[in-house]
């Protein structure tokens, strides 16, 4: 399971000649993701750019079964 948690602090301010408004939204958050069985958990990478979190989880290739032609007589 991949668990991501953090804290958000955002302040938005609007004003003109007659009024002034400030909105603040903040709080902690947590999100969990179930990873597939073939995830390479020791190679997980994360980066944040412009407020966007990108998490990369590489996966092992699933070996496809060998296909064998069988001759049918008759």
From Swiss-Prot:
InterPro entries xrefs: A-crystallin/Hsp20_dom, HSP20-like_chaperone, Small_HSP
Classification via SUPFAM superfamilies: HSP20-like chaperones
A single GO cellular-component term on record: cytoplasm
GO terms (BP aspect): protein complex oligomerization; protein folding; response to heat; response to hydrogen peroxide; response to salt stress
Amino acid composition bias (Basic and acidic residues), ranges on this chain: 8-20
UniProt key word Lipid metabolism: no
Entry keyword Ribonucleoprotein: no
Annotated spans, Disordered: 1-20
Record's subunit section: Forms oligomeric structures.
Record-linked PANTHER family: HEAT-SHOCK PROTEIN 20 FAMILY MEMBER (PTHR11527)
UniProt similarity note: Belongs to the small heat shock protein (HSP20) family.
Protein name: Class I heat shock protein
Taxonomic lineage of the native organism: Eukaryota, Viridiplantae, Streptophyta, Embryophyta, Tracheophyta
């Amino acid at each position: 399971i991949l668990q991501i948690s953090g804290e958000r602090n955002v302040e938005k301010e609007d004003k003109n000649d007659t009024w002034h408004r400030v909105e603040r939204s903040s709080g902690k958050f947590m999100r969990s993701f179930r990873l597939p069985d073939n995830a390479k958990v020791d190679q997980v990478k994360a980066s944040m750019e412009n407020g966007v979190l990108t998490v990369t989880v590489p996966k092992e290739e699933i070996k496809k079964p060998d296909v064998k032609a069988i001759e049918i007589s008759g």
